[in-house]
Amino acid sequence: MSNVFDSDSPTNLAEYSVSELSGSIKRTVETAFDQVRVRGEISGYRGPHSSGHAYFALKDDRARIDAVIWKGTFSRLKFRPEEGMEVIATGKVTTFPGSSKYQIVIETLEPAGAGALMALIEERKRKLGAEGLFDAARKKRLPFMPRVIGVVTSPTGAVIRDILHRISDRFPVHVLVWPVKVQGEGSGEEVANAIRGFNALEPAGLIPRPDVLIVARGGGSLEDLWSFNDEIVVRAAAESRIPLISAVGHETDWTLIDYAADVRAPTPTGAAEMAVPVKAELEAQAAALAARLQGCMNRQMDQRRQSVRALMRALPSLDQLLALPRRRFDEAAAGLGRGLELNTINKRRGFERVGAHLRPDLLSGRIAERRQTLNERIVRAERMVERLIDRSKSRIDRAEAILASLPARFKTQTDRSREALANLSRHGDTAIRHQLARARAELSAQDRVLQSLSYKNVLKRGYAVIRDEDDRPVSQAAALSAGSAVSIEFSDGRIGAVTTEGGAPPASLKKRPAREAGDPPKQGSLF
């Protein structure tokens, strides 16, 4: 400062340089406003700078003042400043001589009453609700019996101990704890990152993915619970693919994460109770259900047993079931033998009648036809017998199938009946074979008789058969005239010939003397 007495100034006012005046103002302001409380609305807040300091302004409807929160102070704040929030800032006013500006250096910051915070919460609730983050359709059902539970909370304190103790008492399962800060600067980001981190785990990874999440914190003031009203936390909870239980504060404390979570628990202990059932209760329910099931099974068995007894009483006995098939089988077996015998007799008689009128040269063809017919009838008879036997066996098999469901006391009777049927079948087969053998033997004997009567056997003894042009046998010489063409059949074939004379035998042929009685014939008899 210059000496006022040496100055030539016409006034008594002191003269200051710009620096002197700025420094004097700075000292005056900092002395007068060394500790002040300012109420205003946060404006121009963009979060902490890269240096860690936060720069913004406090304003009301008529004025505005710049504000700064240094890095060390910012980390100790109980809640995170937000644009438009009405707060009460405590600090000191300072100026910058180089720019003639002043600002308040904030040392503590608190909301301007619960009403301001609640108004901010309501505004944020309306905004997020309009996006559908709180819709009931987004809510997921909690798993009945989770294998792994993820807990997002502070690793120290009573909350995690209460949750672990409650889960261990009710139904011990694997618990994964993601430690986070639950209040203060950066706590909201940590909670949101923990929720997203659990969702990023692979179901079959080294660290198992939880089946349900619990986001928990103990009770506190509205400022203490403010991190769970952060938009980043609410969005992470709404986007979680894992069912999420919010357990923040006490039953009367509501935060925005409670609306985005799938289920809200009144306390952290209540969240543990919602996450797992009571093992003892499940065991008791299982035992009760097992007892009911056993009772139902016993009643069903009794009813089925009574039904079987009633069916057994209604079923006929084994002898009654087999009586009709056995009688039919006996009748078929008896009638078959008699029928074959009568058929053989009738065929023999018919053969004898027909054979008396047939020429020897036609006997062989008729015999072949009869033999074929007889063989066909024998085959049909055998097939008929087989069908009768198969039919009887099928009926008995059906009867056995019906009786298979009856108690074991009928098994012995069934075995005896089966053995008797087998004996009857064997005896019937034996009788039929004997009848067929006798029929074949008789047929062979008749065949031999017919062969012996055949004229071809006579031809083998030196005789011949003469046939006219129409292939009719010629039995008298008068039937031929001179020049007639004839065929002569010998035992080894035929030759053609022409007659030279007709009528009586020629005179050159002398009559042979008659064979004396007792002389043996030189040629065998035709018969």
Swiss-Prot record:
Subunit info here reads: Heterooligomer composed of large and small subunits.
Q: What does this protein do?
A: Bidirectionally degrades single-stranded DNA into large acid-insoluble oligonucleotides, which are then degraded further into small acid-soluble oligonucleotides.
- Supply the name of the protein: Exodeoxyribonuclease 7 large subunit
The family note in this entry says: Belongs to the XseA family.
- Name one process (GO BP) from the record: DNA catabolic process
- Mainly resides where? cytoplasm
Q: Which organism is it from?
A: Rhizobium leguminosarum bv. trifolii (strain WSM2304)
This protein's UniProt keywords? Cytoplasm, Exonuclease, Hydrolase, Nuclease
Stored Pfam families: Exonuc_VII_L, tRNA_anti_2
Say yes or no: keyword Electron transport present.
Answer: no
rRNA processing keyword on record: no
Show the taxonomic lineage.
Answer: Bacteria, Pseudomonadati, Pseudomonadota, Alphaproteobacteria, Hyphomicrobiales
Where in the cell is the protein located? Cytoplasm
Q: Please give an example of a GO cellular component term from this record.
A: exodeoxyribonuclease VII complex
Reading the lineage from the top rank, the first entry is: Bacteria
